[in-house]
Amino acid sequence: MTRDAANILFTRLSQSGDEAAITELHNRYFYRLYKLAYSIVGDKGAAEEITNDVFVRIWEKRSLLKDVVSPELYLLKCARNRALEFLRGQKMDIILSEDDLHDFPLQWEVSPEQLLISSEMVRQINKVIDQLSPKCKLVFLLVKESNLKYREVADLLHISIKTVEAQMAIALKKISQAVPMTFLHH
């Protein structure tokens, strides 16, 4: 969804309480918010509950949405904050479950050239990503999977842009070391 489309949906919600707009937001953003919540709480049921709660809260506070500048970032921050609230309530540590995150492989946009990359290559890349530290993995997935800008990731995670850059450099270096360069250029 484009940022303009998300802005339009937020406007429809805030001005007229358009139920179709909340349904469309839910349909378009549920999976991304769920993945973020899951990466924080490490529990599928809790992540689903948290994600649904985000949309309930958006609906309840819809009159305040007119002032939101970046709806996508706002939704991600809501999911992150709700997940952290959940952890505080459960008195749990923030975790990323390496085993369970296999349920969320990176989605690759496939061009004809990329079709030549073997499933072994994709498996190698995903294996490297799974071996990244939890923080590095989260930063990498937010940039590459969620298509967030470094500034947005920094704001979302309350870290500096330099930290985002450093984590991305670590991830990309490890991937490039594990994957032959001939495959990366196709």
Q: Residue ranges of each PLM-predicted region?
A:
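N-terminal module of bacterial RNA polymerase sigma factors
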Residues: 1-32, 113
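C-terminal edge and immediately downstream basic/flexible tail or linker adjoining helix-turn-helix-like DNA-binding
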Residues: 2-3, 12, 95, 124, ...
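Internal acidic/polar
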Residues: 3, 93-115
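Sigma70-family region 2
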Residues: 15, 55-70, 90-91
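Short, charged helix-capping/linker segments at alpha-helix termini
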Residues: 15-23, 35-51, 184-186
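Structural recognition of an alpha-helix C-terminal capping motif at a helix-to-coil junction
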Residues: 35, 49-56, 69-81
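Arg/Lys-rich amphipathic alpha helix in sigma70-family domain 2
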Residues: 63, 80-97
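Helix-turn-helix DNA-binding module
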Residues: 127-130, 134, 138, 142, ...
